[in-house]
């Protein structure tokens, strides 16, 4: 079991300093970096006695989750559901109560709410509205460094590069992209997708970029089906492979290919993104980029908890790695 002495040794400070930091002694004069180092080490070695900001009080503090999509949409998109699940599991471990808001930003929150976790993409106007809540904010699945808030995202750029590299190594000289176009829920901003940028950069670097191989719709099975079915029926040349920016798009595309007598992976290969449970349930099972959505939520909750314990003025961007999981939609 981890002890104060263990933390003190690793942090290079006295046991007394560790104890006073963990007990939030406001009379203690230490640098922000030292305070943060002690709290981080305590987390890493499993010291849990200090875990929440209210451990000396009987009442529980609350954390609000603001989900950018509706509850109905979340049921259809396990990606955002899993992020929320990760937040809730970690919040329970840290002894916080949860409030939920779906596709809605409240005008105010009670004093018992100490922080807000914002899942999804938000416009500048929406972020300004969130800031007016006067709570500690952490964003998940969007880069809000420029707005001055800590955030957790997936390493989209390297994920796409790794998928495209694999297809190129399999002899695919022409690689298409299936992608969705999103707007913020207030419809004021079109969301720039880093996967599109990464795809373009890679293909241009390799001299294989062809804008005709990019098919844009929305992130649904139906859109994936319609995009590829229309492409096939037009008689246009198909690429050797497609990278689909979601499992849903890939599943729709797979059905269109099968209905038109095009074999996967013999005639065309597919790699999808997210690796939800659906990816392994279709035939053939999809090769997919595994995204650790639940861990994104847990990480965001940890960041919020640390901000409440020892606020840092400099915002941080935490990118989680991914893994290319190969199945039968590639050779």
Curated annotation (Swiss-Prot):
Cross-referenced CDD domains: HTH_LacI, PBP1_GalR
Pfam families, A to Z: LacI, Peripla_BP_3
Annotated keywords: Carbohydrate metabolism, DNA-binding, Galactose metabolism, Repressor, Transcription, Transcription regulation
Pathways involved: Carbohydrate metabolism; galactose metabolism [regulation]
Top-rank taxon: Bacteria
Residues within the DNA-binding region(s): 4-23
GO BP of this protein: galactose metabolic process
Molecular function as annotated in GO: DNA-binding transcription factor activity; transcription cis-regulatory region binding
Domain HTH lacI-type: start-end pairs: 1-62
Gene3D superfamilies xrefs: 3.40.50.2300, lambda repressor-like DNA-binding domains
Protein task: Repressor of the galactose operon. Binds galactose as an inducer.
Protein name: HTH-type transcriptional regulator GalR
């Amino acid at each position: 079991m981890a002890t104060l002495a263990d933390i003190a040794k690793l942090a290079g400070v006295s046991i007394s300093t560790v104890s006073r930091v963990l007990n939030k002694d406001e009379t203690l004069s230490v640098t922000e970096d030292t305070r943060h180092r002690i709290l981080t080490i305590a987390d890493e070695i499993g010291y849990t006695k200090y875990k929440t900001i209210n451990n000396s009080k009987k009442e529980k503090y609350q954390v609000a989750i603001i989900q950018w999509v509706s509850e109905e949409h979340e049921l259809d998109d396990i990606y955002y559901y899993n992020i929320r699940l990760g937040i809730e599991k970690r919040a329970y471990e840290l002894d916080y109560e949860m409030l939920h808001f779906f596709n809605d930003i409240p005008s105010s929150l009670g004093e018992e709410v100490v922080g807000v976790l914002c899942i999804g993409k938000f416009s500048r106007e929406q972020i300004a509205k969130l800031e007016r809540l006067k709570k500690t904010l952490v964003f998940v699945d969007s880069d809000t460094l420029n707005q001055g808030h800590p955030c957790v995202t997936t390493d989209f750029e390297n994920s796409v590069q790794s998928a495209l590299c694999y297809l190129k190594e399999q002899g695919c000289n022409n690689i298409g992209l299936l992608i969705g176009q999103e707007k913020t829920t207030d419809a004021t901003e079109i969301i720039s997708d880093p996967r599109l940028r990464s795809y373009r950069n890679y293909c241009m670097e390799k001299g294989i970029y062809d804008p005709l191989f990019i098919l844009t719709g929305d992130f649904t099975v139906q859109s994936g089906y319609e995009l590829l079915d229309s492409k096939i029926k037009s008689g246009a040349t198909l690429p050797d492979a497609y990278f689909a920016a979601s499992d849903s798009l890939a599943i729709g595309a797979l059905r269109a290919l099968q209905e038109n007598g095009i074999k996967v992976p013999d005639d065309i290969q597919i790699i999808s993104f997210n690796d939800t449970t659906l990816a392994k349930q279709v035939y053939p099972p999809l090769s997919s980029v595994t995204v650790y959505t639940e861990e994104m939520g847990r990480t965001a909750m940890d960041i919020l908890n640390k901000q409440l314990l020892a606020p840092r003025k400099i915002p941080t961007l935490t990118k989680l790695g991914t893994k290319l999981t190969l199945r039968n939609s590639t050779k």
